[in-house]
Amino acid sequence: MKRSLLIATALTILSILPSQAVNIADLENARGYAYLYRMNGQNYYAEQRVNVIAGEGNKFEIIARTYSHQGAQYYMTEYINHYYFDQDTDTIQWVQEQRNIIDARTGRVLREEKRPKAKLITLKPDTYGYMQAIYSKNMAIAAGQLKEVSN
């Protein structure tokens, strides 16, 4: 019993973590990542694989990773985002749980910053983060993890 519990836990952890280190070549060559936009001199990318956690009714959570990189810098930033969707009230809330500084050449994590007391932000179409939330939702729909709900 304990062995099967350990195996299940290990598989869950492995499914959440990326299968390999992410480096700038992966992002720029679109190996499972999409270019989102350029803002303030930084290029932003999103991982095309997202994790969906079901909630009650039309409520669910999506965990998605985004990355930013600036020109000739040898580091990039990984953001682990949690989007909480409530399709009954048509709201999206967002929290950035963790930020990691990564060596852009090797993919090695240089610094981890966990934010256990990060504040939930309600997203609207004109706020930062909304586009990433909708992109993550569309990736979940495309992967068959969610069904599109129309109000």
Question: Language-model features: where?
Answer:
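N-terminal secretory-pathway/extracellular module detecting exported/lumenal segments
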Residues: A21-H82, D86-N151
